[in-house]
Amino acid sequence: VHGDIKSSNIMVKRTGNAKIIDIGSALALDDMPPNRTCTPSYAAPEVLEGRENTPRSDLASLGYVLIEMLAGKPPFAGLQSYRDLLESKRSLAHRLPQMLPADVTCNELLMNFIRGMIASDPARRFPSAEDADLVKEGAASFHRQLIVGGLASEYDNEIRAWLELLE
């Protein structure tokens, strides 16, 4: 578990491949300390509530980064209270159509992928980074869609690379 995935902890190489940095905060699942620090705006709801930080928590954090990239701004900017932040995370999936550009929201595969990353209930998120990549609504399917549509670019591996780093 990385435990602090956020946009400033993801670096993109010239080749277009993404690298998650600040691995010093990562811990084995069986060696989790009782108190951990995190960046609240990127932490999953269950982490903010003091529950266990799991690989699914990292997926939610990565989903928030993806939304930030697609929207061009952090999804939780300007929130002043813990309660507002938590409520905003819980309602995020329903607010995506208002937050994201139309060319993103019209892509059902991409929207389902995002929702599978950020579901407020961890049990409704992808079970693992591998699943987030390989299942029907996963990153690999979206990548194939880009290739078929002639929309793949030299940076088309970013999402998949992040997921591979979480595996």
Which role does the model predict for each range below?
Residues 1-12:
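Catalytic-loop of the protein kinase fold
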Residues 143-167:
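Regulatory extensions appended to serine/threonine kinase catalytic cores
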Residues 34-47:
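Conserved activation segment of eukaryotic-like protein kinases, specifically the C-terminal portion
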Residues 58:
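Conserved catalytic-loop aspartate of Hanks-type protein kinases
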Residues 104-118:
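Conserved C-terminal C-lobe helix
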Residues 121-124, 130-144:
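Terminal C-lobe "cap" of eukaryotic-type protein kinase domains
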